[in-house]
Amino acid sequence: MTWIPLHCHSQYSVLDAMSSIKDFVAKGQEFGIPALALTDHGNLYGAVDFYKECTQKGIQPIIGCECYIAPGSRFDKKKEKRSRAAHHLILLCKNEQGYRNLCILTSLAFTEGFYYFPRIDKDLLRQYSEGLICLSGCLSSSVSDAALKSPEALLLELQWFQDLFKDDYFTEVQLHKMSEESIAGFKEEWLKQEYYSLIEKQIKVNTAVLEASKRLGIPTVATNDIHYINANDWQAHEILLNVQSGETVRIAKQNTHIPNPKRKVYRSREYYFKSPAQMAELFKDIPEVISNTLEVAKRCDFTFDFSKKHYPIYVPESLKTLNSYTEEDRYQASAVFLKQLAEEALPKKYSSEVLAHIAKKFPHRDPIDIVKERMDMEMAIIIPKGMCDYLLIVWDIIHWAKANGIPVGPGRGSGAGSVLLFLLGITEIEPIRFDLFFERFINPERLSYPDIDIDICMAGRERVINYAIERHGKDNVAQIITFGTMKAKMAVKDVGRTLDMALSKVNHIAKHIPDLNTTLSKALETDPDLHQLYINDAESAQVIDMALCLEGSIRNTGVHAAGVIICGDQLTNHIPICISKDSTMITTQYSMKPVESVGMLKVDLLGLKTLTSINIAMSAIEKKTGQSLAMATLPLDDATTFSLLHQGKTMGIFQMESKGMQELAKNLRPDLFEEIIAMGALYRPGPMDMIPSFINRKHGKEIIEYDHPLMESILKETYGIMVYQEQVMQIAGALASYSLGEGDVLRRAMGKKDFQQMEQEREKFCKRACNNGIDPELATVIFDKMEKFAAYGFNKSHAAAYGLITYTTAYLKANYPKEWLAALLTCDSDDIEKIGKLIREAQSMGIPILPPHINVSSNHFVATDEGIRFAMGAIKGIGRGLIESIVEERDHHGPYESIRDFIQRSDLKKVSKKSIESLIDAGCFDCFDSNRDLLLASVEPLYEAIAKDKKEAASGVMTFFTLGAMDRKNEVPICLPKDIPTRSKKELLKKEKELLGIYLTEHPMDTVRDHLSRLSVVLAGEFENLPHGSVVRTVFIIDKVTTKISSKAQKKFAVLRVSDGIDSYELPIWPDMYEEQQELLEEDRLIYAILVLDKRSDSLRISCRWMKDLSIVNENIIYECDQAFDRIKNQVQKMSFTMSTSGKETKAKGNKPNENGHTQALAPVTLSLDLNELRHSHLCILKKIVQKHPGSRTLVLVFTQDNERVASMSPDDAYFVCEDIEELRQELVTADLPVRVITV
């Protein structure tokens, strides 16, 4: 008998069900089920993916939802238990009207009814029931509640739904009955009783519902409330539930684990995808409940029409005065308007200077004719493809943003290849000059719509989105939902935490997963250590097994960083919407690909902070010099800019801040804008290997060769190296007579590795090339090179547009360094680490950072003749409104003359005593009196007197004193306290740092600054330039001490937050050193430390080996520090090694130093290796094992043969092991190596 599952959950029932769409549909196919329903909790998140997967597998998809229905009104949100906030109800789409109504219902559930859950109510059901089939629901339904109350209540509830849905209402029965063997698997008596209670309730409800349904003539269906695929998935599902709840599924007790009674748990283990035979057996006494499911499926006939678009239209002003017009007239008017905009912009965008560059490329033609030809060609493609509306909608958004002072980027993606977009102001880089192709943007050989991605100033993005909402209607615009999934490492950590596994052990497993793109199964295949751990350790195996089940599960929802959907009419006519978590932001329920596939227009509006920085800098420059700069009109041959790049001073330059980019800039020494474009395209995995050759060819150190003379003009600007995707298109055209459109099809095929199409293209390319007189063998060689290149080739249009941003930031830094760094400091004012780097960069350029000043500072950092003035907006606790009132008063009535004048002129409703005190402690009033304690003491009496004076003046009361005061400006009498508390310099600086995030006017280290050179101190900013294993001397202030207990050894250790005046970082102090030098670990203490730098992993790890209090510095202290440094440096040099038999330098992945501590006096660890049995493979395994246990103990290798010691070696290259070697010893035994530990 055929059974159709009608009540099924996927992982889109977030952290409640674990079935992936793919596995769910595959299981249905395995069972030979002709139709499947998806009914996730309260949403349609997975509907499109489910539909596509089903149709691909030949299964009828039924789109549905298990809705939450409020017991009363959806607007009633009284504080009551979560379990009472809503009942459950299944709704299935019969047809398109049903789908539309389900979209509306699930949308309103979020936007109007959300309370614990997205809820609808009976009022909404009355309005939007057409086209829907309703099932009564599970034990959490209102029908089940009524069945447990009384027969009368049940009849009333059923009649309400029957009256509404008529023949499309079905009651639902479920029975999650377990076998006796399975019941015996319950370890807890309370859970067993919960199970019996569940079954008792289900039987009671089923009996009542069947009887009442029969009486009312309502058909009944059997469902199983599927939450996972296989019967043995119940444990992984329980873990998933408690990832959500935050509970552990078990708790430690003595030396074992017991189940956690507080955990979230299903009372039966039968919520899996059962076969039709199993369901038929379960309901063998009432077979009609099985057959009725097929009847439901037959009634459902909804299909998505993926060919239909629901794009908005653009109505030109010329039509808005007309009473009526046809769609054809409207589109024609849009096309005319588009062309009109382009033609009007032609003289402005194509100035004589821009045309001169085009003339250089085409010396025998009028450049304006070339531009017009290109424009006409683009229009001839865009208009017939129906894309005018799209371009005008994007133009409208960008035009509004620019008109309202919101900076917009020069372009992003392939759109920069369009002359039309350049004329419309959508992009700002002229494409003909830089060989950027329209066909890379819109391919005339293909029907697909292009993407126009827009970068917008971060600060103005929300305003732009609000404009789109206002322009197109709030019901027609939404942002796009995203789904965060459990990657392998996250799955391991979630499972480990939920199983209450030791954190160190969880981290040990997780560290074997190298990156976000590596799956757990791949890691098991490729990492022998992880595989051994899985085989030999039961607890680790359990974590890995459960993580394998949960990997890929949806963990949370979010909002797409850029995507905005604009619909031609109300969104809910086509898709469901929701409200993003913890906000009022409307988002689609479908993620990016599904939402586009159902015909929604996506516009990418990406907030780019660099544009904000550019805008702030250019505004400051104009205010100072009167010169108005614009990205599009900067000279692209500025010598000062290129000189800056030659020096590698790329800090603060867009996409060039990394050390690798600094080196590339220094070595390449770019002197053309085209080379900046190439740098951005080259510095990526893949093409990065070509960088040395690119540099050498530029500087004449390597011969530039071309496979064919026709390729020279194409590859000349990149020194004979293929860098851009557009070059593939050009080569195909030059050698094989491809049109640019055909070349783009070839590029796509290569990029997608479509082997079938590639063979067709290979044959086509070689045949055409041969027809053009090219040797067949050479044609094949060139095609192979193109194919290999296409795997990493970059979009030149995008590289050029972003290259312009890079150049602009370099230009500003080179020519207006104070204004540029001030802008960067403003935009990064909430990032203390970035502030430190920028301050260090400013100081390296001879630009001082000045403390905040009440008469100079504003919300932003400000460039002045003397340096960069610290921003009031970066002072903790000082809000924008207060700053605006201070600056406005200052601008209107002149500088403040004293603290008294400031308070007198301030709106005391906005300016509190506390905020004035913060401004004083931040240094804003040092210009009036450097004694901050005296200024603080004056605030209370001044504030009270002036406030009283203002109050009396406002009420019209004039005392004898205030009358006189009106003629004597700012002389309201005050009385200062006799004993003004005086803080130490250390306390003053500590308060300043608390407010500014950094020490600014002075630093506690200034007391030892003169001794730093004698101590050979290296500050944190230089750490990244030093090699792995470096032993460094440094000085810092302890800002914060956090004491912790190591999970394994149960010993105290500390994590220090330290700073050296510019940079701050964390420094772990492990147990042994903590015990020895605990008394030094106090906040605000000045410390000299000897550190070892570990750069074996992607991030820098720092090990502290010695510390000394520097509150007093004398010759003896300096001598002691020097001696300690020499001693530790010698120890570290002895501890490093190279595996001589491997012939390669060890480059192990770094591991966090052992919690048990680093000291300089620990005994070495000696390993004995038997040469009679030793193999190279043994050494490789030994190397891996040793690398996994780094620490501070010297490692000595003793080689024996025939029980005789024949050689020994001490490691070099910073190689040493942890103090507690028990794990190391055990791992050596497990690995079955001819190695034994002979001394510890």
Swiss-Prot record:
Pfam families named among the record's database cross-references: DNA_pol3_alpha, DNA_pol3_finger, HHH_6, PHP
Keywords noted in UniProt: Cytoplasm, DNA replication, DNA-directed DNA polymerase, Nucleotidyltransferase, Transferase
GO cellular component: cytoplasm
Similarity-based family: Belongs to the DNA polymerase type-C family. DnaE subfamily.
Organism of derivation: Chlamydia pneumoniae
EC class of the enzyme, as a word: transferase
Keyword Cell inner membrane: no
UniProt name for this protein: DNA polymerase III subunit alpha
Biological processes annotated in GO: DNA replication
Function: DNA polymerase III is a complex, multichain enzyme responsible for most of the replicative synthesis in bacteria. This DNA polymerase also exhibits 3' to 5' exonuclease activity. The alpha chain is the DNA polymerase.
GO MF terms held by the record: 3'-5' exonuclease activity; DNA-directed DNA polymerase activity
E.C. number(s) listed in UniProt: 2.7.7.7
